[in-house]
Amino acid sequence: MSRTYKATGINLKSMPFGEADRLLTILTREQGLVRAVAPGCRKPKSKLGGRSALFVVNDLMLVQGRSLDKIAQAETLESYPGLSQNLAKLTTSQYLAELTLYQALSGQPQTELWDLFCQQLTQLQNATLAQVPCCLIHGTLKLLAGAGIAPQVHACCVTHQPLDPPTSNPTWRVGFSAGAGGTVTLTGPPRPRTAIQQAAEQAIAYPLGADYRVQGKLSAQELALLQDLNPAEIQPASPLPLPLIATYPLVIWQGVESALRHYAEAYFDRPIRSAALIDTCFTPLPDLTSVPS
């Protein structure tokens, strides 16, 4: 027997379904991820047409089904029209939506994740074009921190030795590993394991004595940027670090994005498909060092 329920949700994913419907993946505050059919929304005069668009926030009345729920009513509360007017902003919002999808759960409240994602969309919509790369990386770090997997960037995760990047050395590199949990020095043996660490190896996904697979490498300036962003201390309400936009050129932000992308993909074991357009979107941007703080 079907039952109805109410939820407030934002559309994260949409695809055609049947002749005139759409299948939506919705992040709701009350029920987490919900997959629901928007009946007839592809018809020209459908009331659900605009309400089934990406990144629209609706008050929903849903009917629970065996495998898919159905939207009975929807009242729009918020939308982000500015995102679709710029390819870089749209691609960035889709990128953050994928990270949100990979960590969202079904059948239980996701209030903090819902609030965080909507906050990032608001910040992104209000950003200037030069601020978009910062929005992407800052938002990515917030989502990783919310999932409990913010990378360690101030010390080697294997040797625990502090890292002080020599920004004047263009050839210096440090490894970046999801298995290790962040930065890994590329030379030197790991610190010997204690008896407790050896006993814990069987209980974790990545053994502490393993030869960690490095997903990418960071230059000294890229590591310096990550350290300035300070993932370990980042909070949902942390403001956009605008002064850093003038400090680091675009190529450094792009390098950090690439490292974080591979880190997240390795951890979630899922590709970030929208990342394919990131380099194309950001290439025409002016050098960020010319943007006043």
From Swiss-Prot:
Protein name: DNA repair protein RecO
Pfam families, sorted: RecO_C, RecO_N
Organism: Acaryochloris marina (strain MBIC 11017)
InterPro entries: ARFGAP/RecO, DNA_rep/recomb_RecO_N, NA-bd_OB-fold, RecO, RecO_C
Transmembrane segments: none
Protein family membership: Belongs to the RecO family.
Keywords, comma-separated and alphabetical: DNA damage, DNA recombination, DNA repair
Role played: Involved in DNA repair and RecF pathway recombination.
Classification via Gene3D superfamilies: Nucleic acid-binding proteins, Recombination protein O, C-terminal domain
GO cellular component assignments: bacterial nucleoid
Superkingdom of the organism of origin: Bacteria
GO terms under biological process: DNA recombination; double-strand break repair
